[in-house]
Regions:
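Alpha-helical transmembrane signal-anchor/signal-peptide segments
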Residues: 26-46
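C-terminal regions of proteins
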Residues: 31, 257, 261-318
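Active-site segments of SGNH/GDSL-like serine hydrolases
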Residues: 229-254
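Hydrophobic membrane-insertion alpha-helices, especially the h-region
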Residues: 6-24
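Short hydrophobic beta-strand that contains or immediately precedes a catalytic carboxylate
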Residues: 49-53, 298
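Structural motif
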Residues: 48-50, 99, 238
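Secreted/periplasmic serine-hydrolase-like ester/acetyl group-modifying domain
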Residues: 113, 117-235
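Membrane-embedded segments
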Residues: 56-145
């Protein structure tokens, strides 16, 4: 038995060392989670306006179009649980913060990194949970899988490692103010039919199922919005709940009931808190095809600039 265990250990040790080395090398690769943390911790003294939310904000609102000292801290796939946690952690380290622009996607009120079975073919976002734990020191559990990028993301990690170390391509496309340029117009699908044909599937993936879990998450996320509103209210910070624009084919085919419930939740928060305002651009017809990367994301170098200028006029016109 001892000989067997010794043999197992002998063969396992190289694999363990290889895994540790691979994990270490993964953590040296630039990523938006680490960079957004850098902005919060190293530029916190300067931040007057911050943009939060998921990819619709991270790719779609250009902070350079807004007043001085605006930073885009939104991250793709960041839902309300982490929006709230990020603010709770950092808001008292941002002494000059006056405004928060919160970009809210069509599916956001029903989304949670820890949940599955709410959308068509969705799953628990273990990789994002791990990224928050490792790179932003924000965690809601003590699971080992969420302490390792390799264990949580698997194939995605191998692809990222290959992209950085073998192909020498960018793995992080944020500019100095935090805008993520992954969705620049030059990166968009050139065949118009292909990106238009992808919109119906996107809508299907973004439409919540009619079940008890979806309703529970919806109610939880409303409470998270109220918690963020209170956090801002107690510190004299204005909160702007912004619904970004979507392409015509997208907004004409979404579930009207879900859309109205999204509006209802946002209005509820805006009506309760005197520091909160809501802005709806969901069906804004000022945006054309080149402004969009896909059905519900603006191009980072074209649409995000236009949207940033519109927000400057609407929010900061005084």
């Amino acid at each position: 038995m001892k000989k067997f265990l010794k043999t197992v250990c002998l063969f396992s040790l190289p694999l363990l060392l290889l895994g540790i080395g691979f994990e270490y090398s993964l953590r040296q690769i630039p990523n938006p989670f680490r960079f957004k943390r850098y902005l919060l911790e190293e530029k916190g003294e300067q931040i007057k306006t911050m943009i939060i939310g998921s990819s619709v904000a991270g790719y779609g609102i250009d902070p350079s179009c807004l007043p001085d000292s605006t930073y885009n801290l939104a991250i793709s796939g960041q839902w309300f649980r982490y929006n709230e946690a990020q603010l709770e952690k950092y808001i008292d380290s941002l002494p000059h913060l006056k405004n928060i622009i919160w970009g809210i996607a069509y599916q956001a009120l029903w989304s949670d990194e820890y949940e599955s079975g709410v959308f068509y073919q969705d799953s628990k976002q273990n990789e994002n949970i791990a990224y928050y734990s490792i790179y932003m020191d924000i965690s809601f559990d003590h699971h080992l899988i969420h302490r390792s990028e390799l264990l949580s993301a698997g194939k995605i990690c191998v692809e990222k490692w290959s992209k950085h170390y073998l192909q020498h391509e960018k793995t992080m496309c944020c500019d100095s103010l935090g805008l993520d340029h992954t969705y620049d117009l030059s990166e968009k699908e050139e065949d118009e039919k292909k990106w238009l044909n992808a919109i119906p599937r996107s809508i299907k993936m973004h439409t919540a199922l009619d079940n008890e879990k979806a309703e529970r998450i919806y109610q939880q996320n409303i409470q998270r919005m109220h918690a963020v509103a209170k956090l801002c209210h107690d510190r004299g910070v204005k909160l702007y709940l912004v619904i970004p624009p979507t392409y015509k084919m997208y907004y004409e085919n979404v579930d009207e009931g879900q859309l109205q419930r999204m509006f209802l939740a946002i209005r509820e928060v805006a009506d309760k808190w005197d520091n909160v305002s809501a802005y709806d651009y969901f069906k804004d017809n000022r945006f054309v095809a080149d402004d969009f990367y896909d059905g519900n994301h603006l191009t980072s170098d074209v649409g995000a600039v236009k949207f940033g200028n519109i927000l400057r006029e609407d929010i900061f016109k005084e």
